[in-house]
Amino acid sequence: MYRWDSIADVSTHRGIKHQDYKGKRVHIEISDDFDNVLSLKMDIGVHKDLDIEQEEYCFDVCFQEDSASVLINSCEQMITEKLKSLIRFGTRSTRYKDVFDICYLSDLADMEKLRFCIQKYIYADTTIDVNDSDEIRRRAERIFNSSTYKKQVERSKKNWLDLSVEEVLKKDLEFLYRI
C-alpha cells in the first residue's frame, strides 16, 4: 500500500499547453516499506470545456482529517485524446504508450460516451481532416501495419501490459471497429 508520507520526490517539470487546457506536468516518485518504487508523471490542468463529465477521485491524506479530491478525465476522453494524437501524427507519433493505454481502456469504455467525445474532439476539429469512424480506422490500420512504427513501439519499452505488441495493435483495431 502506498502512503502519502512515502512520496520521495515531487517536482514540476514544465508547463504544458494543449488546445483544450493549460497546466503543469508533475513527476512523482512513490516508494513503500519494501523498497518498491513507482515513478509517474501527472499532467494537471484546467479544461475550458465543461460539457464532458469528469470523474472524481478522493484520496485520504493520512496526516489530516480532510481528504483531497481531484477530477480526472473519463476513460472515453482519454481514449479520444490518444486517438486524436495518433491520427494527427501518424507513424511519426512518439507517444508509444498510448497504444497500450487504449488497449487497456477499451475494456472500460462506454461506447456512446466515446462516440460523443470523438464527435466533439476529433470530427469537430478543423485542424485534422477526419469526419467519420471509417477514416479513423483507415488511418489506424495504416499506422499499425507500418513495420517501422511497430519496431518503434517494440523498442520503446512502454509496454506495461502482459500482451505482445501484435496482440495490442490487433485489439486496438478490433476496438476501433466497434466505434
Please place each PLM-identified region on the residue numbering:
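Structured mid-to-C-terminal alpha-helical surface segments
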Residues: M1-I179
